[in-house]
């Protein structure tokens, strides 16, 4: 079937919902699509349509991530509903990289919870630049002063993780009451229902506060592969988000990382099930590759302009070691520690060859002679990492360190080391 063409008439922004489990992220996502559908800017999705999101296999863990699209009068949005469960933080690390901004959902009845903090920290580490807060379940809070206290606590928490807590817009409301009103009457307009109006207010704030990102369209093309599909009779499609640059049908690209670098030609591009002649930074796109077998491509490789990036196994980085309260390790680790490094969309085993301290959580508790042999939870360290496979690594790139299904550190590459 011939695909409709994707129209690029408004600025495009990638956002997502983050926050603690059961604080209402999915309900809010549904309410936003239904409210904007009433204005003709979306296809309304009910809660169960988003909640039963297609399963994505990430390293043996099945993760559901819902992608929905909608428009406000000013912009086109692609919205990811990030799973809130602590085990799904992996996807936050690969998925939150897909966000130009986030809507942090906090239950007004409960206030910030451990995962709220973990998601704010991760948003900082994976480079989500801006967020707007939705204080949900307002209908369950009888006392306006309590809601103000929760708002204050949210602002303090944001400050702690170096977001501008005083400036960030906070909108309170009830996603559930808005959604129920919209399910009952899908044509609700502004001014008809106070709960639905709060959803419109939230989207106004998202429009105003989350800047249209400066797309990195002038840099050389790069896409981190998230998934690979085989289309009978057409070939192999690599999907992912264009990190930078632009790409036209017919151009040459290289597949880099994990295996030997391969050169290929782009024979087609698709976005939201529509064909494109050209894709640019920020798009979630499928790239059809000539002469490439499905087995040649895997999650974690990058597609890039030939010669623009090379694979490496050794680099220096600055790393923050999470405390146990943040879900990290309970005990220190030593030189020679071998965790998993999550780089763009890949996890690769690597070894910490050496480290020096930048900032110690409890300087007095560790004897001097141990200080550069032992990294304690809460420390900030400069490390040298040796990966077992080469991947496309570059200066300024962020990554997470994982062990046994949990995030134990977050870092940024400061220097590439030649072998």
Curated annotation (Swiss-Prot):
Any one Gene Ontology cellular component term annotated for this protein: mitochondrion
Any Pfam family hit: GTP_EFTU_D3
Annotated positions binding GTP: 19-26, 81-85, 136-139
Matching NCBIfam families: EF-Tu, PRK00049.1, PRK12735.1, PRK12736.1, small_GTP
Membrane-traversing stretches: none
Region (G3): 81-84
Subcellular location as annotated: Plastid, Chloroplast
Annotated segments matching region G1: 19-26
Key words of the record: Chloroplast, Elongation factor, GTP-binding, Hydrolase, Magnesium, Metal-binding, Nucleotide-binding, Plastid, Protein biosynthesis
Documented EC number(s): 3.6.5.3
Function description: GTP hydrolase that promotes the GTP-dependent binding of aminoacyl-tRNA to the A-site of ribosomes during protein biosynthesis.
Family: Belongs to the TRAFAC class translation factor GTPase superfamily. Classic translation factor GTPase family. EF-Tu/EF-1A subfamily.
Residues annotated as domain tr-type G: 10-214
Cross-referenced PANTHER family: ELONGATION FACTOR TU, CHLOROPLASTIC, ELONGATION FACTOR TU-RELATED
GO molecular function: GTP binding; GTPase activity; translation elongation factor activity
Name of the protein in question: Elongation factor Tu, chloroplastic
Lineage: Eukaryota, Viridiplantae, Chlorophyta, core chlorophytes, Chlorophyceae
Reaction catalyzed: GTP + H2O = GDP + phosphate + H(+)
InterPro entries, per database record: EF-Tu_GTP-bd (IPR041709), EF-Tu_GTPase (IPR050055), EFTu-like_2 (IPR004161), EFTU_2 (IPR033720), G_TR_CS (IPR031157), P-loop_NTPase (IPR027417), Small_GTP-bd (IPR005225), T_Tr_GTP-bd_dom (IPR000795)
Gene (name only): tufA
């Amino acid at each position: 079937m011939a695909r409709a063409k994707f129209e690029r008439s408004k600025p495009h922004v990638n956002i997502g919902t983050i926050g603690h489990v059961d604080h209402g992220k999915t309900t809010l996502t549904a309410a936003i699509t239904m409210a904007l559908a009433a204005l003709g800017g979306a296809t309304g999705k009910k809660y169960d349509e988003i909640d039963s999101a297609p399963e994505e296999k990430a390293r043996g863990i099945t993760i559901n991530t819902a992608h929905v699209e909608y428009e406000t009068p000013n912009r086109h949005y692609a919205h990811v509903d990030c799973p809130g469960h602590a085990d799904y933080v992996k996807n936050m690390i690969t998925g939150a990289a897909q966000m130009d901004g986030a809507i942090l959902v906090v239950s007004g009845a409960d206030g910030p919870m451990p995962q709220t903090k973990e998601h704010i920290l991760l948003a900082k580490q994976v480079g989500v630049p801006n967020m707007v807060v939705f204080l949900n379940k307002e209908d369950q809070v009888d006392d306006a002063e309590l809601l103000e206290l929760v708002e204050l606590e949210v602002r303090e928490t944001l400050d702690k993780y170096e977001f501008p807590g005083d400036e960030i817009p906070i909108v309170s409301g009830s996603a559930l009451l808005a959604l129920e009103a919209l399910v009952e009457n899908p044509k609700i307009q502004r001014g008809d229902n106070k709960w639905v109006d709060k959803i419109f207010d939230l989207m106004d704030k998202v429009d105003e506060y989350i800047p249209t990102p400066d797309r990195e369209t002038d840099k050389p093309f790069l896409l981190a592969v998230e998934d690979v599909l085989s289309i009978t009779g057409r070939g192999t499609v690599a999907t992912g988000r264009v990190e930078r640059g632009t790409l036209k049908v017919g151009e040459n690209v290289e597949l880099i990382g994990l295996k030997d670098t391969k050169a290929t030609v782009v024979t087609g591009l698709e976005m939201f099930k529509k064909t494109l002649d050209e894709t640019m930074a920020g798009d979630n796109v499928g790239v059809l590759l000539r002469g490439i077998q499905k087995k040649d491509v895997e999650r974690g490789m990058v597609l890039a302009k030939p010669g623009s990036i090379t694979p490496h196994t050794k680099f220096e980085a600055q790393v923050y070691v999470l405390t146990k309260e943040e879900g990290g390790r309970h005990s220190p680790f030593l030189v020679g520690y071998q965790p998993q490094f999550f780089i763009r969309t890949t996890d690769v085993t690597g070894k910490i060859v050496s480290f020096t301290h930048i900032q110690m959580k409890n300087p007095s508790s560790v004897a001097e002679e141990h200080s550069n042999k032992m990294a304690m939870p809460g420390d900030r360290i400069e490390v040298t990492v040796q990966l077992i496979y080469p991947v496309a690594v570059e200066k300024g790139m962020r990554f997470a360190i994982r062990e046994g299904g949990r995030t134990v550190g977050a870092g940024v590459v400061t220097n590439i080391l030649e072998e």
